[in-house]
Amino acid sequence: MATPVNAQCSSKTWELSLYELHRTPQEAIMDGTEIAVSPRSLHSELMCPICLDMLKNTMTTKECLHRFCSDCIVTALRSGNKECPTCRKKLVSKRSLRPDPNFDALISKIYPSRDEYEAHQDRVLAKLNRLHNQQALSSSIEEGLKMQAMHRAQRVRKHQHESDNTTFSGGEDNCDSRSHVSNPSVHSNQEAGPSRKRSRASEDSGAEPDLSHEGGVRSPDPPGGGETGSEIELVFRAHPLLVEKDGYSQTRYVKTTANATVDHLSKYLALRIALEEEVLRGEAEGVTLGEVSEKQYTIYICTGVAGGQYTTLNGSLTLELVNEKYWKVSKPLELYYAPTKEQK
């Protein structure tokens, strides 16, 4: 049975929506008027959806016409599913892509100094990485100082425990030797030799000043008595106000004992700088200790909360006192040096 003609016509009729009925075409600008558009507003149109950076060597998909960087879309097709990252439409291979030189030309027209922009971006990233590495270094130094302090305390306790065990075992030996000496008739002449040696050893140990009168028991050593003083890490920097920028301004990292004084650091600094200056000049003669004095350099420490205030340190102060009085933080002690005014 044939379909009526009016039914065919009604099925092919396009019914306009309310929006389509009332919309008007946009008037074209024909008088040469220029409209200013900021590049930032075009960023979403010129951005690669994969790397979120500006498109580079633009490739367009043939099916859905989405744009990507050449390296980004090729890597995505190799490592992921064979589909468009934006709309998930099927992409068989690189044959589903085509280069878009016109879009690259448009980007180069909008951003003529793109190479300079990328170079600036690389410099900023390198600076951020360098600052991140410095922060990691300072945090690792702090963790190292904490671990050193913890191990040092354990070492002191272990040393005290071992010394106590040694002294008590020595007291038992003395008691045994006295029992052997007091009963010579029980033992044979062959066993009398070792007993006499042990009694003589107990008499010799009894002459030591740190044994008590009862049983020869050794008194416990004072804390840290068998070890050297604790170590302090410090950073030497040139004084920012008293040392010229083109002068000698090397930063030094020193690790020494806490009982070292400021004069020790001044003399060490004078000797090191004199040796390095001779190496730079190429002189063969070495520097004698008589020519180096701790008066050549003055040591300062920054005491201001916001920086800029420097206090001169007395040469007789130990680093432990300086750390307790001025620093009081779990970071390497920061000191500043400058030539003494009389030595300039």
From Swiss-Prot:
It catalyses: S-ubiquitinyl-[E2 ubiquitin-conjugating enzyme]-L-cysteine + [acceptor protein]-L-lysine = [E2 ubiquitin-conjugating enzyme]-L-cysteine + N(6)-ubiquitinyl-[acceptor protein]-L-lysine. A zinc finger (RING-type) spans 48-88. It holds the Pfam family zf-C3HC4_2. One of its GO terms (biological process) is protein ubiquitination. The keyword S-adenosyl-L-methionine does not apply. SUPFAM superfamilies: RING/U-box (SSF57850). Its EC number is 2.3.2.27. Residues 148-230 are annotated as: Disordered. It is found in: Nucleus; Cytoplasm; Chromosome. The keyword Nucleus applies. GO terms for molecular function: chromatin binding; histone H2AK119 ubiquitin ligase activity; ubiquitin protein ligase activity; zinc ion binding. Pathway: Protein modification; protein ubiquitination. Keywords: Chromosome, Cytoplasm, Metal-binding, Nucleus, Repressor, Transcription, Transcription regulation, Transferase, Ubl conjugation pathway, Zinc, Zinc-finger. Residues 2-181 are annotated as: Interaction with HIP2. E3 ubiquitin-protein ligase that mediates monoubiquitination of 'Lys-119' of histone H2A (H2AK119Ub), thereby playing a central role in histone code and gene regulation. H2AK119Ub gives a specific tag for epigenetic transcriptional repression. Essential component of a Polycomb group (PcG) multiprotein PRC1-like complex, a complex class required to maintain the transcriptionally repressive state of many genes, including Hox genes, throughout development. PcG PRC1 complex acts via chromatin remodeling and modification of histones, rendering chromatin heritably changed in its expressibility. Component of chromatin-associated Polycomb (PcG) complexes. Component of a PRC1-like complex. Component of some MLL1/MLL complex. This is E3 ubiquitin-protein ligase RING2-A. It comes from Xenopus laevis (African clawed frog).
